[in-house]
From Swiss-Prot:
It comes from the Bacteria. Coiled coil: none annotated. The keyword Acetylation does not apply. GO terms for biological process: menaquinone biosynthetic process. The keyword Calcium does not apply. Its cofactor is Mg(2+); Mn(2+); thiamine diphosphate. Pfam families: TPP_enzyme_C, TPP_enzyme_N. InterPro entries: MenaQ_synth_MenD, THDP-binding, Thiamin_PyroP_enz_TPP-bd_dom, TPP_enzyme_TPP-bd. It is an enzyme of class 2 (transferase). The lineage of its organism: Bacteria, Bacillati, Actinomycetota, Actinomycetes, Mycobacteriales. It catalyses: isochorismate + 2-oxoglutarate + H(+) = 5-enolpyruvoyl-6-hydroxy-2-succinyl-cyclohex-3-ene-1-carboxylate + CO2. This is 2-succinyl-5-enolpyruvyl-6-hydroxy-3-cyclohexene-1-carboxylate synthase.
Length: 545
């Protein structure tokens, strides 16, 4: 068995022993030993292999698989620009704490700087964005026969266990991406006549090095007598000790206590706020947390805590509470929450044309227990937060790490592949077009059993209508440089990828979502964005006393 083949087989075997069940592979020559080993493991039913020709979409497919399954997912590619294309996915995985493993093949290191083709300084390419950068030395035969790699076997397997531990955050409490770079020397294909087994792992299929999850327990004493609100942000865990407190929860975060609509927040004067997770959505929340008159606490599970304004007075992993909220405070919050929700729905009912908010309302109303919902990082996740709270038993995902629109279609496909039930993705047209390559799934590759991608198509960037750039005084330049209309025919685009497509209105969308997709399909709703600014202003005005 040649050295590169032996090393690749050991790496793949140890990944499986370490709990890896899905791997995304991009074709190439330098990573051929890994490709052969992965194909063999897939054929043996030890893992599920997903082939993709575009490394950028492959990275986000791996993110979708990882966040839905809650397990590390390697994405394997050849050397050169193939590795650089993982940059956006690595950034997202870093800030969203997703166990993404970038397993890159490399040229032998002595080839660096020689002008050799497709050879770049890729070790360390991701810098501070990864939890660890780990490399294996070149595989070399120790001798002849079955024991020719015994000395290196332990080093290879130990390195894989370090990669998995760093990705899971077992010792740090901080899961995230890892770069695992393996230089491979020719020959890059297995010997046709070889019958030799790879160096063995531990008995019973156990990992070479077992790692236990470290537990971080930092109690934080909080008196709940002052009027308090909870802000539940992305990545938060459920906090039973906060179950009776009004909670502004992002769609991807747990609702710890009674729901509090984000648009009701400016009408309240809380004396303290408790952050769980990382808030990423609402300006009303940002203003509250920046108010020096509000005492702010942060509860997180990892080493980081959010504190954009510098107002946090204490951090911990759980709250040790004393006192309790005033009944009058709870009643006031409940009344404002109900009013905000009624106003939003009433204004949508009276609006003459469908907007992204209308589409979000239909999608949120159609969810049922066991569903998985993926929201685009632009307007869809914000629209969902305004129209409803997710139903119990519905898991909500969104790429909120750096909140880019990159790879959202691929993330949805990956999430659906890892979920046994129905998955619905709600995204905008620009997000859909930005990752249209995510629809490219090769013949014979695993495909989602039940994924509906709902595209709210307002022919451009509707979110900018609601930001400073959308002020009427900038109307002369807005449409071209912020609105960015494209006029694309999404039906034709889907047809090119052989994906079923149907254009529907909101009522038809509701009927479609009453059933299952039976595969992957796209439902497009034509919406308009020119009235979004006025609609949001009207809602805010009618909520105010």
């Amino acid at each position: 068995m040649n050295p590169s083949t032996a090393q690749a087989r050991v790496v793949v075997d140890e990944l499986v022993r370490g709990g890896v069940r899905d791997v995304v592979l991009c074709p190439g020559s330098r990573n051929a030993p890994l490709a052969f080993a992965l194909q063999a493991a897939d054929a043996a039913g030890r893992l599920r292999l997903h082939m993709r020709i575009d490394e950028r979409t492959a990275g986000f497919l791996a993110i979708g698989l990882a966040i839905s399954a809650g397990a590390p997912v390697p994405v394997v590619m050849t050397s050169g620009t193939a590795v650089a294309n993982l940059g956006p996915a690595v950034l997202e995985a870093n800030y969203a704490r997703v166990p993404l493993i970038v397993l890159s093949a490399n040229r032998p290191y002595e080839m660096l700087g020689t002008g050799a083709n497709q050879t770049v300084e890729q070790l360390g390419l991701f810098g501070s964005q990864v939890r660890a950068t780990i490399s294996l030395g070149l595989a070399e035969a120790d001798g002849a026969g079955a024991g020719s790699y015994d000395q290196q076997n332990s080093v290879w397997r130990s390195a894989v266990c370090r990669v998995l531990a760093a990705a899971r955050g077992t010792r740090s409490g901080n899961a995230g991406p890892v770069h695992f770079d393996i230089p491979l020397r020719e020959p890059l294909v297995p010997d046709l006549a070889e019958g030799e087994a790879e160096p063995a792992g531990r008995a019973g299929g156990a990992p070479w090095t077992a790692t236990q999850y470290a537990t971080l327990d930092v109690p934080l004493e909080i008196d709940l007598t002052p009027d308090t609100v909870v802000v539940s942000g992305h990545g938060a865990g459920l906090r039973p000790e906060l179950a009776h407190l009004p909670t502004v929860a992002e769609p991807t975060a747990p609702m710890h206590g009674p729901a509090l609509h984000p648009l009701a927040l400016p009408l309240l004067t809380p004396r303290q706020a408790i952050i769980t997770g990382r808030p990423t959505l609402h300006r009303q929340v940002s203003r509250l947390l920046a108010d020096p008159a509000v005492t702010v606490y942060a509860l997180t599970t990892g080493p980081r805590w959010p504190d954009v304004s510098g107002n946090v007075v204490g951090t911990g992993t759980r709250a040790v509470t004393s006192g309790g909220p005033r009944p009058e405070w709870l009643a006031h919050c409940r009344e404002l929450d109900e009013k905000a929700r009624q106003v939003v729905r009433a204004e949508l009912a009276g609006h003459p044309k469908p907007t992204g908010l209308h589409v979000a309302a239909v999608v949120m109303d159609a969810l049922r227990e066991g569903d998985q919902l993926l929201l685009g990082a632009s307007n869809p996740v914000r629209d969902a937060a305004l129209v409803a709270t997710p139903r119990p038993g519905v898991r909500v995902l969104s790429n909120r790490g750096v909140a880019g629109i990159d790879g959202t279609v691929s993330t949805a496909v990956g999430a659906a592949l890892a979920h046994p039930g129905r998955t619905i993705a709600l995204i905008g047209d620009l997000t859909f077009l930005h990752d249209a390559a995510g629809l490219l799934i090769g013949r014979g590759e695993p495909r989602p059993a039940d994924l509906t991608i709902v595209v709210a198509n307002d022919d451009g960037g509707g979110i900018f209508e609601l930001l400073e750039q959308g002020d009427p005084q900038y109307a002369g330049v807005f449409e071209r440089v912020f609105g960015t209309p494209h006029g694309m025919d999404l039906a034709a685009l889907c047809a090119a990828y052989r994906i079923p497509h149907r254009q529907v209105d909101p009522a038809e969308l509701a009927a479609e979502l009453a059933g299952d997709a039976h595969g992957l399909r796209v439902l497009e709703v034509i919406t308009e964005r020119s009235s979004l600014r006025e609609l949001h202003a009207t809602v805010r005005a009618k909520i105010a006393p």
